[in-house]
Amino acid sequence: MRGTRLMGLLLALAGLLQLGLSLKIAAFNIRTFGETKMSNATLASYIVRIVRRYDIVLIQEVRDSHLVAVGKLLDYLNQDDPNTYHYVVSEPLGRNSYKERYLFLFRPNKVSVLDTYQYDDGCESCGNDSFSREPAVVKFSSHSTKVKEFAIVALHSAPSDAVAEINSLYDVYLDVQQKWHLNDVMLMGDFNADCSYVTSSQWSSIRLRTSSTFQWLIPDSADTTATSTNCAYDRIVVAGSLLQSSVVPGSAAPFDFQAAYGLSNEMALAISDHYPVEVTLT
């Protein structure tokens, strides 16, 4: 009996050690994330609960001109320790008066930010830019995983231009390679990569999909929406042998927070109409 208990304890400790050495990453489109949402204590508590699952999380649809909502979120996340989460945030992005930011939240005890940049996609006023919201790129150093340095490219595509924007992510990858001499890159976000925005016949024209360089971790069969639709809008794509070999098999999936927390449809949709998509690295 004592030996059985000891074995159980050792297995539990091994599991905790493995958890400590792994890295959990997600992309989460929080619909209209701003002061109104973060002023609702119930919604804020669920958002905080979801974010705390991750070591790095990309939040999209940040509608927060003065970063008041971002500040509130960080206050909640760091209420016990001011260094639990740090952040990187983009400038407001968009071709017209409607603007969004990309927000990266990360645990500094697990990763460090080495560099950041905003992808230059051409002349917006000339009408020859590639993206409605130019991808934000962050280079991370991981303290524990097989891949020690990797970049994350964030994209929330414009639904009407999803095919062209996803295709243009191929050029963003080449730009990251050239700028940082880095092959290990994760491209993620709400690509609007399914249903009427990207049809099955259009995939053959998307280089990010046809090139063998890239692995698509969230399949077309996934449902990343909290609505009645069944669409794999949100994706995680990885390139580079070290990063690809660091992915825990079967770990990439949407996180259905409605089912996990027993929420009503109304409450789930109040949080967001998208589920986070997540993956674990070791």
From Swiss-Prot:
Gene3D superfamilies xref list = Endonuclease/exonuclease/phosphatase
Covalent S-S links between cysteines: 123-126, 195-231
- A Pfam family the protein falls into: Exo_endo_phos
Q: Name one GO molecular function term.
A: DNA binding
Marked site, Nitration by tetranitromethane destroys a Ca(2+) binding site and inactivates enzyme, at 87
Where does this polypeptide localize?
Secreted; Zymogen granule; Nucleus envelope
Which sites does the entry annotate for glycosylation?
40
- Which CDD domains does this chain map to? DNase1-like
Which residues does UniProt assign to the signal peptide? 1-22
The yes or no answer to whether the keyword Hydrolase is present is yes
Q: Write down the position(s) of the site called Involved in actin-binding.
A: 35, 89
Q: Which cofactor does the UniProt annotation name?
A: Ca(2+); Mg(2+)
Offer one example of a GO biological process linked to this entry: neutrophil activation involved in immune response
Q: How is the cofactor bound?
A: Divalent metal cations. Prefers Ca(2+) or Mg(2+).
What the record says about family reads: Belongs to the DNase I family.
Q: Which PANTHER family does the UniProt entry name for this protein?
A: DEOXYRIBONUCLEASE, DEOXYRIBONUCLEASE-1
The record describes the protein's role as: Serum endocuclease secreted into body fluids by a wide variety of exocrine and endocrine organs. Expressed by non-hematopoietic tissues and preferentially cleaves protein-free DNA. Among other functions, seems to be involved in cell death by apoptosis. Binds specifically to G-actin and blocks actin polymerization. Together with DNASE1L3, plays a key role in degrading neutrophil extracellular traps (NETs). NETs are mainly composed of DNA fibers and are released by neutrophils to bind pathogens during inflammation.
The name of this protein is Deoxyribonuclease-1
Q: Which organism is it from?
A: Bos taurus
Lineage runs: Eukaryota, Metazoa, Chordata, Craniata, Vertebrata
